[in-house]
Design a protein with these regions (language model features):
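Basic polycationic patches enriched in arginine
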Residues: 16-20, 24-28
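Ferredoxin-like alpha/beta domains used as RNA- or RNAP-binding modules
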Residues: 32, 41-231, 236, 259, ...
Length: 303
C-alpha cells in the first residue's frame, strides 16, 4: 500500500465526495503523468488482485479504473454507470488501495441517493456536474391507483433497460420520479407508457425538482454487552443473539453492504447492518457504558 501511495502522490487523479452545496475547495495540486510513467509506477493487475474479491468484482473494478484513466489521459470528465451501495463500497476500497483521495465524487441526483455514479474530474473542473450524466423523469398517474417500486422497476426492465442505467426510484402518491442515465432518457420518454395496468404520463424534470419522500425510521434505544455484529444485529432486528448468529453464518447478513460471516465482526457508529427479508438499520449513535458495563446504542431502523 505504501508503494502504491508513493507512485500516485503526483498524479492528477483525486477523489471528492462531499455533500451537495458544500463550499468548493480553494486549491488543488494535480500534476499530470505521462501514460508510460503511470504504467511503470503502478501494476494494474496487482492492484486488482489486491482489491477484487471475486471475478465479478474484478470486472467492475477494472471498469472503474478504465473510467479513471480515461479522465486522466484525455483530461475530460468521466463517469461509471449507476452503482449499488455494495458496488460503491467496492469502488471506495479500490480508491483507498490506490491512494486516490481527490478529484472524483459519488453522485445520485440527491443527497440521500442509494444508487450513485462515480464521477471522475479533470484538473480544470472544480465540482462534479451530475446533470451531464443523469436526468430525472416524472411519471404521473391517478392518485386512486396504487403502484410500488417493483411495478416501476418491472416496467423499465420490460423495456430492456438494465439496472446499471437506473438510479433511485422515488414513489409518491400519484407520481414517481425516476433517476436515469441521460443517454436512455429519450428512449424512455417515448416508450414508457404504463406500469402494471396503470397508464402513465412521463415528462423530464430537473434533478433539483425531484420529489424525495421523507425518510421513515424507527428509533431503537438499547444496550448491548459488546459491539460485536451478532449482539448489535440481535438488538436491531429484535431477536436472540443465537438467532442472529445463525443468520450471519448462513450469509444473510451484510455489514456496510458487504456479506459478513463472522459473528464477532466489530461494529461502529455509522455502520449499516442489513439482513435479507428483515430490512436494514443504521447504528446512529454509540453511547457510553451503563453501570453494568453495557454499551448504549441508538439505532435507526428503516421502514
Amino acid at each position: 500500500a505504501y508503494e502504491i501511495a508513493q507512485c500516485l502522490v503526483g498524479s492528477e487523479m483525486c477523489i471528492r465526495d462531499r455533500p451537495r452545496g458544500a463550499a468548493r475547495a480553494k486549491r488543488r495540486v494535480c500534476v499530470p503523468l505521462a501514460h508510460a510513467e503511470w504504467e511503470s509506477m503502478m501494476d494494474r493487475r496487482q492492484l486488482l488482485d489486491r482489491a477484487a474479491r471475486n471475478g465479478d468484482e474484478r470486472v467492475l473494478l477494472a471498469h472503474i479504473l478504465d473510467k479513471c484513466e480515461q479522465s486522466r489521459n484525455r483530461n475530460i470528465p468521466s463517469a461509471t454507470d449507476f452503482l449499488s451501495p455494495a458496488e460503491q463500497r467496492s469502488a471506495q476500497d479500490l480508491l483507498h488501495a490506490a491512494a486516490i483521495h481527490d478529484g472524483c465524487a459519488f453522485c445520485g441526483g440527491f443527497e440521500r441517493a442509494e444508487r450513485r455514479m462515480l464521477l471522475f474530474l479533470p484538473d480544470w473542473q472544480e465540482e462534479a456536474d451530475e446533470s451531464e450524466y443523469m436526468t430525472a423523469l416524472r411519471c404521473t398517474y391517478r392518485k386512486e391507483d396504487t403502484l410500488t417500486h417493483r411495478d416501476f422497476l418491472g416496467s423499465l426492465m420490460a423495456q430492456g433497460v438494465t439496472r446499471e442505467k437506473l438510479g433511485d426510484i422515488l414513489v409518491s402518491e400519484g407520481s414517481c420520479d425516476l433517476i436515469v442515465s441521460r443517454d436512455i432518457a429519450p428512449y424512455l420518454l417515448q416508450n414508457v407508457t404504463s406500469a402494471g395496468r396503470v397508464k402513465l404520463s412521463v415528462s423530464e424534470i430537473e434533478l433539483s425538482d425531484l420529489s424525495v419522500p421523507k425518510l421513515k425510521v424507527k428509533e431503537i434505544r438499547d444496550t448491548v454487552s459488546t459491539l460485536r455484529l451478532d449482539a448489535v444485529a440481535a438488538s436491531g432486528f429484535s431477536m436472540s443473539r443465537g438467532k442472529a448468529q445463525e443468520l450471519i453464518s448462513s450469509g444473510r447478513v451484510q455489514l456496510n453492504y458487504r456479506e459478513t460471516l463472522k459473528s464477532d465482526a466489530p461494529v461502529a457508529q455509522g455502520d449499516v447492518i442489513s439482513a435479507r427479508g428483515l430490512g436494514k438499520f443504521e447504528v446512529a449513535e454509540v453511547g457510553g457504558l451503563s453501570k453494568k458495563g453495557r454499551t448504549a446504542l441508538l439505532l435507526h431502523r428503516y421502514l
